Each structure stands twice: as structure tokens, then as C-alpha cells.
Amino acid sequence: IIDFIPQIE
């Protein structure tokens, strides 16, 4: 399971 939240800083 790959969990990631794309965030733009």
C-alpha cells in the first residue's frame, strides 16, 4: 500500500 498526499508548497 503506497499512501501519499501531493502537496504544493
UniProtKB/Swiss-Prot annotation:
Main location group: secreted
Localization (cell): Secreted
Expression by tissue: Expressed by the venom gland.
GO cellular component, one term: extracellular region
Protein name from the UniProt record: Venom peptide 4
Keywords: Secreted
